[in-house]
Amino acid sequence: MQNFRDYYALLGIPQSADQAAIKAAFRKLARQCHPDLNPGDRQAEERFKQISEAYEILSDPDRRAEYQRFSRYWQQQGAASVGSDDDYGDFPDFDIFVDELLGRRTVERSPRRSARRSAATSSALSRDLERSLEVDPKTALQGGSAQLQLEDGRLLEVDIPAGIQAGEYLRLRGQGIKGGDLLLRVQLQASNFQVQGSDVIYTLNVSPAMAVLGGQVTVPTLDGPVQMKLPASLRSGQRLRLAGKGYSKPSGDRGDQIVVIQLQLPTRLSPEERQLYEQLRSLEQSR
């Protein structure tokens, strides 16, 4: 089968990998090829889609088992083994199989195909519902809850585990269609904190006087405000680092917060400020 995808190879894990290993492998690869970190890179975008698909299937025990049965079937050149109920002849294309496995489409099967597999697969998968869930970076790091309004009017309160990454899925049992599951793909909300891998980017507006002289300032972080000493002679775009104030890593450690300096020129001046700027200009011109 030409378009078959080996999900274990995509994630770089053995077929015996447990759920923790699958999750860790996905997190590592997702940070490397996330579209936000590779703007305009089509290869990275396609790679991210593939590893997300691999994680979506391998992280679910039922889907993983179905995928492995499908793999064995086609490795045997489409011949169902004696005494086996598995017959995947209705799926000549791997993408069609994945679409049904993820509930994207329903494939009409021959009535002679396995009744056990047909009933179990189409019944279970056709009822799952997939939606996106936006979570602010602070809640994603520390854990908490988020609300989601569904099309049918239901308002769900979703528990967010601490350290969840963009692209990961949360499964709500029984909240899909006709008792199926609701799969929520986590997306980080746009905010003053931009998560890039395990680092967090924050832009700090700095006055001309503070940029020239430096000094103590209060900087917001995901953990709350902290004091930071700015060096003198700062440039707009210069980056400073707050160690350990970034996002969580699979190891449990934290990345850093990168503070990007943005020079903020005053739009209105008091008489005293204008006088001081005029004096400064005179000094500069007399050099």
From Swiss-Prot:
One of its GO terms (molecular function) is unfolded protein binding. GO terms for biological process: chaperone cofactor-dependent protein refolding; DNA replication; protein refolding. Binds 2 Zn(2+) ions per monomer. It is found in: Cytoplasm. It holds the Pfam family DnaJ_C. Its cofactor is Zn(2+). Residues 117-126 have a biased composition (Low complexity). Residues 108-131 are annotated as: Disordered. Disulfide bonds: none annotated. Keywords: Chaperone, Cytoplasm, DNA replication, Metal-binding, Repeat, Stress response, Zinc. PROSITE patterns: DNAJ_1, DNAJ_2. One of its GO terms (cellular component) is cytoplasm. Its main location: cytoplasm. InterPro entries: DnaJ_C, DnaJ_domain, DnaJ_domain_CS, HSP40/DnaJ_pept-bd, J_dom_sf. Residues 6-71 form the J domain. It comes from the Bacteria. The J domain is necessary and sufficient to stimulate DnaK ATPase activity. Zinc center 1 plays an important role in the autonomous, DnaK-independent chaperone activity of DnaJ. Zinc center 2 is essential for interaction with DnaK and for DnaJ activity. Belongs to the DnaJ family. Participates actively in the response to hyperosmotic and heat shock by preventing the aggregation of stress-denatured proteins and by disaggregating proteins, also in an autonomous, DnaK-independent fashion. Unfolded proteins bind initially to DnaJ; upon interaction with the DnaJ-bound protein, DnaK hydrolyzes its bound ATP, resulting in the formation of a stable complex. GrpE releases ADP from DnaK; ATP binding to DnaK triggers the release of the substrate protein, thus completing the reaction cycle. Homodimer. This is Chaperone protein DnaJ. It comes from Synechococcus elongatus (strain ATCC 33912 / PCC 7942 / FACHB-805).
